[in-house]
Every structure is written in structure tokens, then in C-alpha cells.
Amino acid sequence: MERGSPGAGAARLPRDQDSVEAWLDDHRDFTFSYFVKKATREMVNAWFAERVHTIPVCKEGIRGHAESCSCSSQQSSRADSSAPGTPTRKISASEFDRPLRPIVVKDSEGTVSFLADSEKKEQMPLTPPRFDNDEGDQCSRLLELVKDISSHLDVTALCHKIFLHIHGLISADRYSLFLVCEDSSNDKFLISRLFDVAEGSTLEEASNNCIRLEWNKGIVGHVAALGEPLNIKDAYEDPRFNAEVDQITGYKTQSILCMPIKNHREEVVGVAQAINKKSGNGGTFTEKDEKDFAAYLAFCGIVLHNAQLYETSLLENKRNQVLLDLASLIFEEQQSLEVILKKIAATIISFMQVQKCTIFIVDEDCSDSFSSVFHMECEELEKLPDTLTRERDANRINYMYAQYVKNTMEPLNIPDVSKDKRFPWTNENTGNVNQQCIRSLLCTPIKNGKKNKVIGVCQLVNKMEENTGKVKPFNRNDEQFLEAFVIFCGLGIQNTQMYEAVERAMAKQMVTLEVLSYHASAAEEETKELQSLAAAVVPSAQTLKITDFSFSDFELSDLETALCTIRMFTDLNLVQNFQMKHEVLCRWILSVKKNYRKNVAYHNWRHAFNTAQCMFAALKAGKIQNKLTDLEILALLIAALSHDLDHRGVNNSYIQRSEHPLAQLYCHSIMEHHHFDQCLMILNSPGNQILSGLSIEEYKTTLKIIKQAILATDLALYIKRRGEFFELIRKNQFNLEDPHQKELFLAMLMTACDLSAITKPWPIQQRIAELVATEFFDQGDRERKELNIEPADLMNREKKNKIPSMQVGFIDAICLQLYEALTHVSEDCFPLLDGCRKNRQKWQALAEQQEKTLINGESSQAKRN
């Protein structure tokens, strides 16, 4: 193979590389010098990357780790060649297994917060730099510097040490470091992080002096703007040099070496400056000085980049913690607008280091003015007065900027109010103390959720330097953070205003309920009349025939039905056992009667009274009384009388389809829940509290049974639960000692009494069926007229001829099996079953007769045709 061929060179290449590497190891001085002169930023970054190791975690131990390593290439190749698989998760769940700071912490007072205290971590001390000029030791110094960079994130301290290292190479008299910053208008400027670092100077001395330089002005500004280094032999001969600093410090600047510091995107993030070469070359910086300076500044760029990332992460973490605290605050405090805004203002002042915070609330009735103003100053943080806005402080609040922001709906950031010419009041020498004390100002509108309406304005005055206490302008970060703050302000204001509106609505509701309960209660004259009759004489149950299952109320007046009800309470020993006052009982009975609507054909007071009479007959004549407790008997009788209170003559289906407000209150058994609520309202109305003699536990138990009994009258619930009851009866496993079976039995008993009209003697049953049909047909007419739907046959007036067959179907599907089961529990309830069967026969006969009539009519019509 020929000498010049690629193959020959490649064959000898490994041996040459080894020789070169060995020679470089033996000549460290040359290696370091070559690296400093020739190394690029990419080489330095690659050098760092090579030394960043990821340590695999293997639960199977060393063996498992070895196995995983040995087969990793096979797995990766299979993964690459396979079909689309499960997407790789960016964050593994195991990442959260590492020890992290708790999300929620407690402060010294035990208050729960998302805002953690600043963590004080012990850091390794910086290695003191060595200033010997031995080039053979420069590599060691460089490695020491790299070690410090990898373990520290303090920009000032690291750059101070870098300058001291540089001093050993280029021997300048002074060094300075300037960082690039932006103001609220995104205009760049330079701030000194280190100024006049000299041999023997301390970090504190170099970092105390803070100087601001304009962009593209002066030597430093020019280097920052162009991104190119400058090596000036005589500063006073350069027109870009600003001699004011020398005049202030009394220092004579001669030669300057100024270089930009760039990040990985080649953006200028800072400028380093060396002043006055101390020895050699006539006091001017050489080309070697430039290369050495540039090499070390590459490390400055790395330091700045890492530190900026770290500071950004800390700032974002702090911001998130504060915003989480604000979110927590909003959910904790919703009752008082003043309290929540006081806490929000305190958070803003302490976090953003401002002198004053004022929150203006827009007047809803007059959008050109503010309804309330909440003002706080930094001196008040420790006091946190109960009242933020005081009359004596009115002259310390400036409303004009807030009014401007409210009208424009845009943020306002004024770096120096005295120099701003946009507002006429800033140019007038009014002598206003408030105007004179404002230097920098940041004002942001607080908008509602729809972002199209300003509900308030947040105004911050005078941002303070953390160390010096001097006023400085608000920057873009402040604007962004305040924008986030006012979102939470808006949420807090809206939530609190909604809470206050709900409280006002509840107060109005209480007044309305008070008025309704007054009008819902029976009149005093009617109560006294019934009380007088009851005191004179109340006929016996036998005389009134209220123990008969065949009882009819058609011949009784409303007053007589009330007397019958009093007799029921008396004969069931409820008046005596629960210390009911006769006046209260009379008023309650008449109030219940009053709250049934008279324009409803069937579900009115008479139906409720008949349900209660059937319950009384079942308890007495049906011998069920001895199976129940006194509280259960009391609850059942109250429920029977109240189970259809305020019935509107329509069923639950109509309420839902018509989108009645009642449908929004309950998800099921709409009318039954409403009946119970009405029952509860009457029981709690003054003068109607027949349960006042009960203990707290007895009262709770009674209300629970009443509610269950009233809800049980919903036929949908009855159909859902009856199977279990019938199965227990069929298997002869029914046991009233079991609480669940007892509750089930009370529900079935309530339904049996509610449907008891189907068991009455035929003349009574026919008359009641007509009332039911009238009510159902009225609902059908409303469905056709209001909802534009065709009603079901049961509600359809045009299907009136189907009433007999529908009654037979109703008895077979709903009633018959219920009364059969009830008779198994108590044989004395057989009259209910017997009456139901007899009425079925009557309805069946009518249905057959109507069917024959219909068939005959169709035959006659066919013959005529």
C-alpha cells in the first residue's frame, strides 16, 4: 500500500495518537498554554459534558445492573425496529421518590403555608487562588477553578475569584464586571456586579459599589452593544471613554481591556473590564493578555449561565409558592372583602418590596368612581390594622392613576413620575404631599373572569432596593408578577362579592320565609274556633267511623275533618306522650290544611286527610299499632297529613319537562322533597311546633322517619323497593326487629295508605276516580298547550273511555300485590285487600262492557257502510 494512501495513514494513526497523548501528559505546561490559546467555547462545553455522569439505579442490584447493561444495545435496537409502542414518559413516577422539600410547610406559629423559608445550605468554601506565575501550575489552578464552578452558584463570589486568577496572568490594576439588564420598556442597560477588583481586595469591597451604565455608551456600553472586545492603550484618547467615573473615584485610567461575556446562544450577558496593565509592554495589554482574558471569561460565561438558570428557577419557585399561598388564601377567606384584600396587599408589599399598595374597588352602580379603597404601607406589615382605609390617610392615596388605568384597561408603569409628561397633574406644582412622595409607580387593572370588565385596580408605589432602601423603577418582571397577582385579586374580589351576595340573598330568604310562615299559619280566629270545639267535645272514633277502612269524608265539613284529626292524635296517645298543647295542635292541623291548594282536584287536603284516616285505621283496626314505637306512629301520622303539601296538580315528569325551578333543587322525587320541605317549614313556624316536647335525639329520629315516609309516596321509589319486601314476605323471612326491614315496611305502609282510595266501596271509588281523572286530564291539557307534546293515555282527555281498563292495569301492576303482602303482615288489614279485589271486578266489568260497546259500534258502522 502506498505511503500517501488513506489506508496507510489510518493504520499508523493509533500509534501516533498514543505518542502525542503521552508527550502532552509529560509536558503539562505546553498542554495548558495550548488549551488556553486554542480552546473554543464548544471544546470547553464538551469538556464539561464528558464529566457529567448519569448513575443508573437498578433495583436488582449489581447483577441486575450488569445484565441490563449487557443487553441494552439489543433492547434499543429492538425498540427502534419495532412498531409504534408506548410513548416514553417525560417524567417517571420514581422521580418523585427522591427526597424533596415538603409542598406544604408550617411556619414558626404553626400556620400552614406553601411558602417555604429560605434554605440555608452549607457550601464548600472557595479555594483561595494561587498567584504564582509558574506556567506549570496553571493547569492545577484551572482545575481548582472548574471545581469551584461545579459546586457554587454565587455569581459575585465566583467572578471575583476568576478575576483574581486572571490577575495572575495579565497583571492589571483593577477589574470590573457588568451584567446586562432590562428595564420595564425592554431597554437594556448595564449594572456593575463587581467594581474595581484589585489585588488584595475583598469580595465585600468589590460588590458594595453599584454603578449603572447606559447601553451603547462609553467603553463598556459599546462592547456590550457590538459584542466585540476592545484593547485601548490610552483611554483619554478614545472618544467613547467617559471620564466622569475617574472624577468621582479619583482614579486615573490609562489602558483598558474590555471583553464581552456571552452565553451558549452567543448573546452578550455581561462585560468584563481590566484597567491599567501594571508591568511590561509599556503599560498596555498584549495579544496574549487578550487570549488569556478571553479564556477565563469563557468560564465567567458558564458561571453566569448556570447562575442565571439557578436564580430563575429560585424565582419561579418563589413565585409559584406565593401564588399557591394566594390561592389558598382565597379559598380560606371569602366572608370579608376587607380582610382578604388586606392579606393580599400584605403579600404583595412583602414579596415585591414596595412602599405602598392600594387596591381600588370599582363601584358597580357608578363605573366612574370607586366604591371602596384598601391602602397599606410597608410600615404597617407588622401592625396589620383592622381598618386599612382611614380618613386621616385619604390625602396619601392618589386616585388619578387608578382612574386612568380603569378607563384604558391597560397596565401603567412609570419609572419616574416627576419626569413623566403624559399626565397634567404631574407637571403642576400643587404642593400635594402624596404626589411628591411618588417616584416609581406600577398600576394594573383587576378584571373579571370574562376579561371585559374592570372590577378594580391595584396600584404599587415606590419599588425599594433590598439593601439600600433606595427607590428604583419597576421592571418587566414586576409587571408580569403583578399581572398574576391581580388574577388572584380578581378571584378573591369576585368570590367575596358572590359570598356577600349569597348572604344578602339568604337574609332576604329568611325574611321571605318569615313572611310566608306567617301567612302559611292558620288564622287566630279559626284556631280559636277549633280549639273551642275540641275543648267542648270531640266525638269518639267509633262515632266518627275513622277506624273503618270503608270511611268516607264526603259528608264532612273541613272543620269536622280537623276534629277527626284531633281524635286520631288523642286516641294514639300522641298528645299525652309528647306533651302537645291543644292550641298548638289545632293551629298546626289548620295550617297543614291551609297549605293544600284548593284548585287541585284530587291532591288536596281531603286526600291528605283520607290518607291519615287509613293510617289510623291500619294502626287501630289493622292491629299494626303494637308493632311500632310511639315515635314511628307520630312520624307516620304527621307524614300522612303532610305528604302532598303544596301539590300543584302535576307529577314529577311534568315538573322536569317544564323546567320548573323545583327541578333544579332535587335530582329525584322532586315533588316529594318539596312536600317534606313544606312540612318542615310548618313544623318550625311559631305556634305550630307540635314536636317541641321531644328531646333532640327524638326530634332528629322523628324528622328522619317523616322524610322517609313522605319520599316513599313517590311511586318510582315504591316500584324500585317493593321487590325486596315482597320477596321477604314470600319466603316468610320478614322480621320487624331488623331496622332495615322495619324501614321498608313503613315505606310500604305509607304507599298502601296513599293508594287506599282504590280499596273504598264502589260508589266512593268511582267518585274519587273521577277526581283523579279530572286532575290528570288538566295536566294533559297543559302538556299539549305549554309543552307541545302529546300526553300519555292516562293524562289524555281524548282517551277517557280507557279509564276502566287503565284502572284494572293500575290495580294489577301497583296495588293488588301490595295489599296482599300487607295482609300477610297483619291479617286485620284484609279489608284493604278485599276492597281492592272487589273494585278490580267492577272496573273489569266496565272495561269489558266498553269493549263490547266499541265492537258493536264498529260492527254497526261497518254494516251501514
From Swiss-Prot:
Zn(2+) binds at H607, H643, D644, D754. Mg(2+) binds at D644. Residues 69-92 are annotated as: Disordered. Inhibited by zaprinast. It holds the Pfam family GAF. Binds 1 Zn(2+) ion per subunit. Binds 2 divalent metal cations per subunit: site 1 preferentially binds zinc, while site 2 has a preference for magnesium. Tightly binds zinc. 3',5'-cyclic GMP binds at Q807. GO terms for molecular function: 3',5'-cyclic-AMP phosphodiesterase activity; 3',5'-cyclic-GMP phosphodiesterase activity; cGMP binding; metal ion binding. GO terms for biological process: cAMP-mediated signaling; cGMP catabolic process. Its cofactor is Zn(2+); Mg(2+). Keywords: Allosteric enzyme, cGMP, cGMP-binding, Cytoplasm, Hydrolase, Magnesium, Metal-binding, Nucleotide-binding, Phosphoprotein, Repeat, Zinc. Composed of a C-terminal catalytic domain containing two putative divalent metal sites and an N-terminal regulatory domain which contains two homologous allosteric cGMP-binding regions, A and B. This is cGMP-specific 3',5'-cyclic phosphodiesterase. It comes from Canis lupus familiaris.
